[in-house]
């Protein structure tokens, strides 16, 4: 259903929709795959390379990435940016020390890059550099994705796309039950 919803949204906005499976990992250098394995850390790098390649080899003004587990609730949703790139923003709700907390985070489940974007090649180089120098036993799942983007956002002030968020387990459980502390924030 997720893929179908994104495909429908793409048609609604006259975007070209493409699905890429594990071939995505073919874009990741061998040394990187050896260090990280096939998973989110490798996908973070591959996504950037794929989008850069699409911008340089196709006649497009911009590219938009939506993760395979994104579900589009409203086909009228707009994804655009006044800057050369944009990333998702979510309000993540979870319990911390017995209290529900809501935090705004940046994520890369959705991202947009335009032609001539200087951030995209910088991100590719930075992600490779971080992984090259990282201790393989200390690579965190979001190290070169959301955590890196959040750190850079404090310096660069990316355009954010809050219309594409994520639902924590606490929020999902409260939605399912129709009530709960995660929905009261």
Region spans (language model):
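N-terminal anchoring/stem segment of glycosyltransferases
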Residues: 1-36, 42-43, 114-118, 134-137, ...
């Amino acid at each position: 259903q997720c893929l179908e919803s994104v495909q429908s949204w793409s048609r609604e906005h006259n975007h070209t929709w493409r699905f890429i499976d594990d071939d995505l990992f073919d874009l990741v250098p061998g040394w990187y795959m050896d260090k990280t394995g096939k998973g989110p850390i490798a996908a973070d790098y591959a996504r950037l390379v794929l989008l850069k390649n699409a911008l340089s080899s196709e006649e497009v003004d911009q590219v938009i990435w939506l993760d395979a587990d994104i579900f589009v609730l409203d086909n009228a949703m707009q994804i655009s940016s006044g800057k050369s790139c944009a990333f998702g923003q979510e309000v993540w709700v979870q319990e911390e020390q017995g209290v529900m907390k809501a935090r705004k985070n940046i994520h890369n489940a959705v991202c947009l890059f335009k032609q001539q974007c200087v951030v995209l090649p910088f991100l590719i180089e930075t992600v490779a550099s971080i992984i090259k120098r990282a201790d393989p036993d200390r690579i965190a799942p979001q190290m070169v994705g959301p955590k890196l983007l959040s750190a850079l956002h404090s310096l660069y002030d990316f355009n954010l796309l809050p219309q594409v968020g994520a639902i924590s387990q606490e929020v999902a459980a409260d939605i399912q039950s129709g009530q709960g502390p995660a929905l009261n924030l």
